[in-house]
Amino acid sequence: MKRTKSIHHASFRKSWSARHLTPVALAVTAVFMLAGCEKSDDTVSLYQNADDCSAANPGKSAECTTAYNNALKEAERTAPKYATREDCVAEFGEGQCQQAPAQAGMAPENQAQAQQSSGSFWMPLMAGYMMGRLMGGGAGFAQQPLFSSKNPASPAYGKYTDAAGKNYGAAQPGRTMTVPKTAMAPKPATTTTVTRGGFGESVAKQSTMQRSAAGTSTRSMGG
């Protein structure tokens, strides 16, 4: 009898714990999940230039101009660099490349190497930029330069991509989208020249990773 009574008590304690602790655990988990979502995403707008931004944000012309100019400077620092104009044009299309400033992120030995081959090095024009609120709730804006290819053979053709090759959809300014906060973080400076087709390979790899991540997320949500 004592043994049976003991078993009943143990069963009662287990049942009580399951009833009373599980909802608390679930609630705590939900709070952390919501907090994680709030910290991981940012809403940004995509513009081609400062005029597009000003038209969409009356009264914010100064902020739009500042963000655009900062994006241009960031593009000079982080855009893929090519030793020759031909390599850049093969990747981004005719009329989409420019000579990069001498100190645009390149290490001295790489500058010398590029300049020996073509007199300078080349980079794609900034096709647009993302603009969002500063991390931490600051009053200013964060920006990220975007690039796009006019060469149909390139994986970046008709798309907005950042300096790392991540794809943000069709190269259509005026859109608003949600991106991870890491998307607006400064990218590392370009310190070496890219071989012909190298940036396109990066875009293709990033697109594959994005599709894989999206598929994993969908399967997880669906059980």
UniProtKB/Swiss-Prot annotation:
Compositional bias (Low complexity): 178-195
Domain of life of the source: Bacteria
Compositionally biased region (Polar residues): 204-223
Encoding gene per record: ygiB
The family this protein is said to belong to: Belongs to the UPF0441 family.
Protein name: UPF0441 protein YgiB
Pfam families reported for this sequence: DUF1190
Positions of region (Disordered): 178-223
